[in-house]
Regions:
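Generic beta-strand/beta-sheet core signal
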Residues: 113, 134, 169, 197, ...
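PLP-dependent enzyme catalytic core of the Aspartate aminotransferase-like
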Residues: 345-349, 355-488
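Conserved N-terminal alpha-helix of the aminotransferase class I/II PLP-enzyme fold
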Residues: 44-94, 115
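N-terminal "arm"/small-domain region of PLP-dependent enzymes with the aminotransferase-like
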Residues: 1-67, 444
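Conserved small-domain helix->loop->beta segment predominantly found in fold-type I
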Residues: 284-363, 367-368, 390-409
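Conserved PLP-enzyme active-site core in the AAT-like
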Residues: 7-13, 19, 23, 82, ...
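Short, glycine-/Ser/Thr-/acidic-enriched flexible segments
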Residues: 32, 173, 228-229, 244-246, ...
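Short acidic (Asp/Glu) and glycine-rich catalytic loops that position anionic groups and cofactors
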Residues: 248-252, 270-279, 321-326, 356-362, ...
């Protein structure tokens, strides 16, 4: 049966809701903006409130007989060649947890790349899953981690034949991509499922010059944040499933366990609209973004002291398998300024927001929403940054450990350490103790310390010096990291 991608069930249902002038005696209590605070209405506009209706008993009837959401999800699945798709309004942080709970349970093993996002670790804590960490490919020269390779997963399965499946992150926030097809083959040779955290890859299915995406590569579950590289609203996420290793109803059940019973129709509408936009114009829009990104990369490379990381930097033996050029990662070590200091200056003095920031890099993601006006402002700001860089060089330095020093020993299950008896100790006394909390430089959100890992002096020094240089640590109990929560 042919699929009509000009349709957008959620958006159409919202139009119908307004046309009918339905009178609501249900939540939300603002009653189509009438009860909202005037100052909020002035800032947000009434359109936000007019679109904020119940999914069941509002957008659809109380028994969801119109199947508004189901039809939108089927269209999304068709657009990206998945067998089944589910929308979520709690971000991929929820979606990836639901995927993990569909594959492994308490005290069961799951192979996980150690470059996973903190939401994956949260899933381990909640479920009591035992992680078998698969080491990323470390680029010691650039102090950067790339996804593990198929042979890394094969070795981990050989050492842990009782593992229930695997999870890999690809692309990374830096744009480095794994050999997903090879990893899927390793998993499927054992009749085990592969989960791909593809939060940064919503755009990948829509242009042949972009890296292969998870469903095409044979993954069983793929988690995607439509709000990151797509046109969705914040928290808009989908997960796709295919094959016979993870029943779709099981995945939906696990998502229902974690998700809200009051999903945002606004977020659903953003997901539905993104799918239609990409199904009808995706190749054109992504092609334009790729051309623009290539121009921007070339222009930045001409600025003294700046270097744009490219395929030659990220791909090759012992590195990543593929590369997404839209996250424009700029190495600014040549101008002697940390990424933290540079990002703060760009925001304060040029009103330019950078996304990814670390001790030597800043990142500007280029999407189909950019044009030569936005990128022109970016380039002008970067030229000015390079010019005034000598004035910013008095910032504290970050003591970055070697790849071997960054790897901590896991001596307890994350869940056991997180929920067990714990105490706060001065950071000077924490080395050798077992962490009872996550400590995560953000962005990109990859924990440096996990619950259950044995703390070491190099990692603690890295975090303390990073904090002094401008690193953001959102999760430790002591935000100044003068103390650390450890297992008693």
């Amino acid at each position: 049966m042919s699929v009509d991608h000009t349709r957008a069930p959620v958006l159409e249902a919202l139009v119908d809701y307004r046309r009918r002038g339905r009178l609501s005696f249900t939540p939300p209590g603002h009653k189509q903006a009438r009860g909202a605070d005037p100052a909020v209405r002035e800032v947000l506009g009434d359109a936000v409130f007019l679109g904020d209706v119940l999914a069941a008993g509002g957008l659809d009837d109380r028994l969801t007989r119109g199947q508004v959401l189901e039809r939108a999800e089927k269209l999304m699945a068709d657009a990206v060649h998945a067998e089944h798709t589910f929308f979520t309004t709690c971000g991929s942080s929820l979606s990836v947890k639901a995927a993990m709970l569909s594959v492994a349970g308490p005290h069961e093993k799951l192979l996980v790349g150690r470059d996973a996002h903190k939401s994956v670790v949260s899933g381990l804590v909640l479920a009591g899953i035992e992680p078998v960490w698969v080491e990323p490919r470390w680029d010691a020269e650039r102090h950067l981690a790339h996804p593990p390779a198929p042979e890394d997963f094969a070795r981990a399965f050989a050492a842990h034949p009782d593992a229930k499946g695997a999870l890999v992150t690809s692309p990374t926030p830096y744009g480095a991509c794994a050999d997903l097809r090879g990893i899927a083959q390793v998993c499927h040779g054992r009749r085990l499922p592969l989960i791909v955290d593809e939060a940064w890859g919503a755009h990948l299915p829509f242009h042949p010059d972009l890296p292969s995406w998870a469903m095409d590569a044979g993954a069983d579950i793929c988690v995607t944040s439509i709000h990151k590289m797509g046109s969705g609203l914040e928290q808009g996420s989908v997960f796709h499933v295919q094959g016979d290793l993870v029943p779709p109803q099981l995945l939906k059940n696990r998502s229902d366990l974690l998700g809200t019973t009051s999903p945002s129709v606004l977020i659903y509408a953003g997901l539905d609209g993104w799918r239609r936009q990409m199904a009808l114009r995706g190749r054109e829009l992504m092609g334009g973004a790729l051309e623009l990104a290539a121009e921007v990369r070339g222009a930045i490379e001409e600025i003294d002291g700046l270097h744009v990381n490219d395929r030659d930097d990220f791909c090759g033996a012992g590195l990543a398998d593929d590369f997404d050029p839209l996250p424009t990662i700029i190495d600014i070590s040549g101008i002697g300024v940390t990424g933290y200091r540079a990002a703060d200056w760009l925001r304060e003095h040029r009103e330019v927001e950078m996304h990814l920031v670390d001790h030597r890099r800043i990142g500007a993601q280029i999407t189909h929403g950019d044009d030569r006006e936005t990128t022109g402002e970016l380039l002008a700001a970067l030229k000015e940054l390079a010019r005034i860089a000598p004035d910013l060089r008095d910032a504290p330095e970050v003591d970055v450990p070697s790849p071997a020093e960054l790897r901590l020993e896991q001596v307890a299950l994350p869940r056991d350490a997180f929920f067990g008896s714990a105490e706060d100790v001065p950071v000077a006394e924490a080395a050798g103790r077992i962490a009872a909390e996550m400590i995560t430089p953000y962005p990109p959100g990859i924990p440096a310390v996990l619950p259950g890992e044995r703390l070491t002096e190099p990692v603690l020094r890295y975090l303390r010096t990073g904090l002094g240089a401008g690193m953001y640590l959102p999760d430790p109990g002591d935000p100044e990291l003068e103390s650390v929560r450890v297992v008693k």
